[in-house]
A protein has these predicted regions:
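Acyltransferase
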Residues: 100-126, 154-162, 168-173, 202
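A short helix-breaking turn/cap at a secondary-structure junction
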Residues: 23-106, 168-172
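Predominant activation on well-ordered alpha-helical scaffold segments within soluble catalytic domains
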Residues: 17, 23, 52-59, 109, ...
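Structural signature of FAD isoalloxazine-binding scaffolds in flavoprotein oxidoreductases
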Residues: 11-17
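Short connector loops at secondary-structure junctions
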Residues: 89, 117-137
Length: 202
């Protein structure tokens, strides 16, 4: 099956269910037809019972799509396959943290060993700004949610809910069409995009 992942909506459910989920690299899989939430973060990816299953689905859905302006061309995608050293960076200080299950850490380290055995060089990288990543994620995601979902007004796009006036119809459509969490994200996104709060968040 397929899912969309903005901040973990493929990877985390897959982990909880004991299956494999892949958030694909930006631009490798078309997002045409996807209702955008956070455009710089949203990606479509497969779920499967094994890495091999996920790989097969990925081969089918990846590739350039002229209907998606963020979709990478085959020429650009091919550059990453050109010669040179095969290096993968792993932020080990982030992996070796309190609270990581021993079995998860064991499987992770075994995966690193398998990667090395295929000819890749694995380097420990220091991402010293990682502790700020969640704050940055929330600001970007909320702002993009507010912008992207503004079009779903029940007139041009989305669910249309009747009301006594056009204004009431607009409010009813937004209320009926979006759940509480989505409405919260829209509100917070509108807040962080307000000019008066620019210095506070950016």
């Amino acid at each position: 099956s397929l899912g969309s992942d903005t901040g973990g909506s493929i990877r985390q459910p897959a982990s909880f269910c004991g299956i494999v989920g892949l958030k694909t690299t930006y631009g490798n899989v078309s997002r045409f037809g996807l209702m955008a939430m956070g455009s710089s973060l949203d990606q479509i990816g497969p779920f499967g019972n094994s890495v091999e299953d996920v790989e097969e689905v990925y081969k089918l859905i990846s590739g350039h799509d002229p209907m998606d302006s963020t979709s990478l061309t085959e020429e650009v995608r091919g550059r990453s396959k050109e010669g040179g050293r095969k290096i993968i960076g792993v932020p080990m200080s982030f992996v070796n943290r309190e609270g990581v299950d021993d079995e998860v850490l064991k499987n992770f380290n075994e995966s690193i060993d398998k990667i090395k055995s295929t000819g890749y060089e694995v380097k420990d990288v220091d991402i010293n700004q990682l502790e700020k990543a969640l704050s940055v994620y929330y600001i970007l995601m909320f702002a993009e949610v507010s912008s992207n979902l503004a079009r779903y007004d029940g007139i041009r796009y989305g669910l249309s809910h009747p009301g006594e006036t056009s204004i009431k119809s607009y409010f009813e459509s937004r209320t009926a069409g979006f759940g509480a969490e989505v409405r919260r994200r829209i509100l917070l996104g509108t807040y962080v995009l307000s000019s008066g709060y620019y210095d506070a968040y950016y």
